């Protein structure tokens, strides 16, 4: 067991019965020329987030945590995105951007595309799990819940993009399913203005989970921390 300093209070968990969730670290969300950038969102400050996720993943893997990578997107025909009868059709900024810029049709968040791929710096390793997801929440229409329950995992540590959309949506759904969710704030990035990041973190630490940072997380997983707790 290890204790992680967090807001609003510390949380204790067993790393070997916990998972690090990396949400949508795709070119679409973190790279110039990707979907978010083309849709008018600022991705200029995502590089430190990528580096911090690398650090968190390395520490989590060494501590025996399961690493789960999400990729958001749909089939090449966008059947999985839903048609006009789906609210996703009307609210997805990727779909709206392609409708407004027909030359982008088939390029944004389509499985197999550069946009859909994880950024070059983040490479899943053997033993990691990579899951596609068709909506903001990683629990919707994916096997995430059954994967976690079959392994006795109840604690989830979140990183990725976007804090105020897919990260928060997945953590909230996990809360409703009795999972303990922690966000590493400097390993996440918002879609939109800075206040969106602050609002998402406020919601999480006040109502749905806990907030910490990468350095504190790595310190908690270090052998000396385990020795102190034991």
Swiss-Prot record:
CDD domains: cysteine_hydrolases (cd00431)
GO molecular function, one term: hydrolase activity, acting on carbon-nitrogen (but not peptide) bonds, in linear amides
Listed GO biological process terms: nitrogen utilization; uracil catabolic process
Gene3D superfamilies reported for this sequence: Isochorismatase-like
Keyword match Ribonucleoprotein: no
HAMAP family reported for this sequence: RutB (MF_00830)
Family (UniProt): Belongs to the isochorismatase family. RutB subfamily.
Function noted in UniProt: Hydrolyzes ureidoacrylate to form aminoacrylate and carbamate. The carbamate hydrolyzes spontaneously, thereby releasing one of the nitrogen atoms of the pyrimidine ring as ammonia and one of its carbon atoms as CO2.
Protein name as it appears in the record: Ureidoacrylate amidohydrolase RutB
Species per Swiss-Prot/TrEMBL record: Escherichia coli (strain SE11)
């Amino acid at each position: 067991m290890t204790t992680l300093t967090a807001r609003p209070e510390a949380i204790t968990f067993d790393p070997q019965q916990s998972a690090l969730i990396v949400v949508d670290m795709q070119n679409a969300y973190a790279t110039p020329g990707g979907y978010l950038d083309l849709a008018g969102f600022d991705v200029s400050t995502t590089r430190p987030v990528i580096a911090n996720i690398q650090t968190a993943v390395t520490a989590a893997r060494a501590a025996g945590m399961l690493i789960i990578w999400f990729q958001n997107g749909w089939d090449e025909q966008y059947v999985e995105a839903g048609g006009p009868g789906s609210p996703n059709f009307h609210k997805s900024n990727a779909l709206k951007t392609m409708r407004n810029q027909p030359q982008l049709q088939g390029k944004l968040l389509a499985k197999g595309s550069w946009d859909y791929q994880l950024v070059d710096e983040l490479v899943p390793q053997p033993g990691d799990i990579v899951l596609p997801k068709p909506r903001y929440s990683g629990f919707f229409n994916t096997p995430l819940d059954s994967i976690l329950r079959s392994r006795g995992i109840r604690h989830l540590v979140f990183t990725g993009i976007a804090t105020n959309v897919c990260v928060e949506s997945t953590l909230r759904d996990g809360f409703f399913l009795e999972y303990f969710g922690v966000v590493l704030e400097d390993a996440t990035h918002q879609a939109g203005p800075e206040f969106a990041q602050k609002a998402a973190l406020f919601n999480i630490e006040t109502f749905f989970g806990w907030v910490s940072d990468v350095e504190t997380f790595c310190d908690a997983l270090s052998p000396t921390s385990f020795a102190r707790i034991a």
